[in-house]
Curated annotation (Swiss-Prot):
Belongs to the mannitol dehydrogenase family. NAD(+) binds at A3, L4, H5, F6, G7, A8, G9, N10, I11, G12, R13, G14. GO terms for molecular function: mannitol-1-phosphate 5-dehydrogenase activity. This is Mannitol-1-phosphate 5-dehydrogenase. The gene is mtlD. GO terms for biological process: mannitol catabolic process. Keywords: NAD, Oxidoreductase. InterPro entries: 6-PGluconate_DH-like_C_sf, 6PGD_dom2, Mannitol_1_phos_5_DH, Mannitol_DH, Mannitol_DH_C, Mannitol_DH_CS, Mannitol_DH_N, NAD(P)-bd_dom_sf. GO terms for cellular component: cytosol.
Amino acid sequence: MKALHFGAGNIGRGFIGYILADNDVKVTFADVNEEIINALDKEHQYDVILADEAKTTTRVHNVDAINSGGPSESLKQAVLEADLITTAVGVNILPIIAKSFAPYLKEKETPVNIVACENAIMATNTLKDAILDITGPLGDHIHFANSAVDRIVPLQTNDNLLDVIVEPFYEWVIEKDAWFGPELDHIKYVDNLTPYIERKLLTVNTGHAYLAYAGRFYGQPTILDAVNDDNIRHGLENVLKETSQYITTQFNFTESEQAQYVDKIIGRFKNPNLSDEVTRVGRGTMRKIGPQDRIIKPLSYLYQNNLKHDALIKTAALLLKYDDTNDQETVEKNEYIDKHGVEGFLKSFAKTDDQLTSEIVKEYNVL
């Protein structure tokens, strides 16, 4: 089996490539980072190191890489030969990579599964729409399967450029009905993906976002520092109580199941062998304040149903306070707020109504 994976960064190598290689899949990475592409093409292997006490190490073999910066014969050949095409590039980049390989799908005669592995709800649909905008209708042998992915891969610098440190925990869930062919090991195939996507997004990503924005506000430089701050950790617990109410109300997870899941997630945040800078986790504020994203989506539901939502109000306010001159979205956010005010920003980007906007603005003003 052959896979073409777009995104040769830490998540691509340390999570998606790692799982595929463990299934004896021949992985070709596609990226625009020439340094990484050249290294992969030279070494054809790298180490994945678990952030546990033993630093358990697995060597990933039999990989190669190609540049995906534009049309090329090597990229075309990789698409035509692939049984699986995956991505880990960021949901905003999906339309860009679609341009690089979509035309080749018109020439493809063999079945392929296409799976976007992004921190976003139904990201494969986003990729599919971008592809079909370019190609028009494709044959029934092109299969698009949505997925939910979860593995913390921190910002890192290693002696070997290709080696990557990851947390021991991972979860990769794929739509069963949309998948073609034999199922792969270490991947969960489910009939209804939405509960898993939303549980992960509104527990892991919402919790991570709160720790990043609260950590930045209260002077804690890393996620580990933030979660070990009693005040911030108490706030995190309150945030996840609120998102848990949304999750158990909307989906078929019991309160006990969700409480156990929350405990597991907080334990992951506390892993002393795995820390991350709050500035890396906090970046992308314009996207993260969106109405269907990790903060406003559960907040709006709880607000509309007269359920407790104070902690999520504070999370939204902390995001608005967040400042990082190295993150372009945050720079744009702050420039917009300076010009149009917090209320104008929320109405334009969070799409909150007058009352909910007022609650967030009030919290913002007292921080």
